[in-house]
Amino acid sequence: MKLLKDLLVDRKEFEDWKNNLTWARDGTLYLTTFPDISIGQPKYAKDINCNSKNLFHVKEFPLEFENKLDFELAQQNGLLNSQPVCYPRVCKPSPIDDWMAVLSNNGNVSVFKDNKMLTNLDSKGNLSSRTYHCFEWNPIESSIVVGNEDGELQFFSIRKNSENTPEFYFESSIRLSDAGSKDWVTHIVWYEDVLVAALSNNSVFSMTVSASSHQPVSRMIQNASRRKITDLKIVDYKVVLTCPGYVHKIDLKNYSISSLKTGSLENFHIIPLNHEKESTILLMSNKTSYKVLLEDELHVTADNIIAPYLEKKFKKWSTIWNEFNNYETTLVIHGISLSPDGYSIAIVYDMERVAFKYKIASEQSFNIMFAPLYHTWTISERAVGLAWYQTYQIYNQSLPKLPENFSMNKKLLNGNYPISLDFQSYLNALMKSEEMRIIMFLNMTIDKPSILSFLEALYEYAINKKSELTNSFDLACVLSIAAILKREAPIYNGTLLMKNSFLEETFNLESFTADPETVTSTTNNTWKRCGVTLLPILTTHVKICPVSKQRVIDIKRDDLNDYGWFTRGLLERFNEISVYCGTTLEVM
């Protein structure tokens, strides 16, 4: 496939970490540039001209950190005494929520929503137990685990208060190293209900973490070693780790170990190929890459997925900047991240001469390459909104695999609506359905986005609860939906009084059945409709969908109108996410 033109990151500087790039579920790229994080904010364009700059807008994303150890004097880790300024080492967005956790250089793990800090994780204990060097999100529930300098895993759970704000609290801890040992926890990976951690003495532990296991029991699956672990992943219940000269596989079913000599002392990145029929990974370093099949024994083949693209880019660069081969040149990889759905890969790299040269940040320029890992792709629940659109463009605008005879008017959940649920749970069930995910994606590829299937599901719920529809805003909404679907409406009589900061307008309920795009008041003024509730938009407090351009009333700022349970529920559920395509709504 033809690749998109690389995304450029100019006038920035990376620290010497290998986890400098993360791809979030909404399509945002997080880059741990110094001193402030940079992001590749996803954006929508109908025609991107095969250029990734039309999919991402690179900008600085400054965060304010707290240092809980600011006035502590470290006895064992003297580096903490000499690093008063906080800067990011690792960024990881939550796989199920819109939060991001950041590990700083001085042992803090902070959680942010947008650029607002929610918490700086902390627990009781001595300094070493409160100093963190790695963390991982729970892939299933809202919780997070951190590893400290005492060889201990600390689990923090999350609950939401009455204002729907998350509160993080220390729940439990598991000690991996022996008492009195000073081995740090350096790696944590969490796959479904399996958690694997490695210590600074290169021993590896595994445990099963689930709702039923209140106190997980750890098991050592690799003894301490003098070879430093450089990367650690879980692939199909197999632990894969790399160290200088070797790659090891530990089967979690029988704890058998297979090893393979790589023939290179390079630090390898492990790239799981989760959508292959057999357990397969790519091993990638600055100089070489391999494809490894994780059977009983490890089988190595040439990398025919990423290597050809990188070799082509390296030859092109050498033709321009090292035409006569006067210099030794190398490709330096600063970070690798799978797309949230696992179908694509992003690699941040640069080409450089092997020579002593002083560079300042304003001279730096890095490239981010996007490449497909397979020939086809499907719409995944692990991604949302523009992340699907990015995969679509990376695969040269090839459509994903769709169910047979699928249409935009297909009933959600095959028409088996869970009417017995409360309204918010019902909306969540609709949005999580496979049909709704496909509709939201297809809305990004057509000229006139449609949510008729979603309106059909809303109508069925409203008719089932019609005895509870007494509010005029709710009645107007249901009347509008019935008119669009050409279905029977519960009531036609009555009026609706709607307000904004400057005026009031009265509407006959009958007027909501005339035009699906606009509503005319009794004073003969015509108003555009809200994209979710189909109510007239009088207020300036609205948000807009970047794809469909539909406007939605911002319920958090519009406090003048007495919305009912139906319309208020819709506006609260879709206050941040577009029902048309799953993208983040933009504030106007």
UniProtKB/Swiss-Prot annotation:
Xref: Pfam families: zf-TFIIIC
UniProt key word Transcription regulation: yes
InterPro entries named in the record: TFIIIC_Znf, WD40/YVTN_repeat-like_dom_sf, WD40_repeat_dom_sf
BP GO annotations: 5S class rRNA transcription by RNA polymerase III; transcription by RNA polymerase III; transcription initiation at RNA polymerase III promoter
Region described as Sufficient for SPT15-binding: spans on this chain: 399-588
Site annotation Involved in the interaction with TFC6: residues: 358
Record localization: Nucleus
A single cellular component GO annotation: nucleus
Assigned keywords, A-Z: DNA-binding, Nucleus, Transcription, Transcription regulation
Disulfide-bonded cysteines: none
Subunit structure: Heterodimer with TFC6. Component of the TFIIIC complex composed of TFC1, TFC3, TFC4, TFC6, TFC7 and TFC8. The subunits are organized in two globular domains, tauA and tauB, connected by a proteolysis-sensitive and flexible linker. Interacts with SPT15 and directly with TFC6.
Protein role: TFIIIC mediates tRNA and 5S RNA gene activation by binding to intragenic promoter elements. Upstream of the transcription start site, TFIIIC assembles the initiation complex TFIIIB-TFIIIC-tDNA, which is sufficient for RNA polymerase III recruitment and function. Part of the tauB domain of TFIIIC that binds boxB DNA promoter sites of tRNA and similar genes. Plays a role in TFIIB assembly through its interaction with SPT15/TBP. Essential for cell viability.
Comment field (misc): Present with 2070 molecules/cell in log phase SD medium.
Name of this chain's protein: Transcription factor tau 60 kDa subunit
Organism name: Saccharomyces cerevisiae (strain ATCC 204508 / S288c)
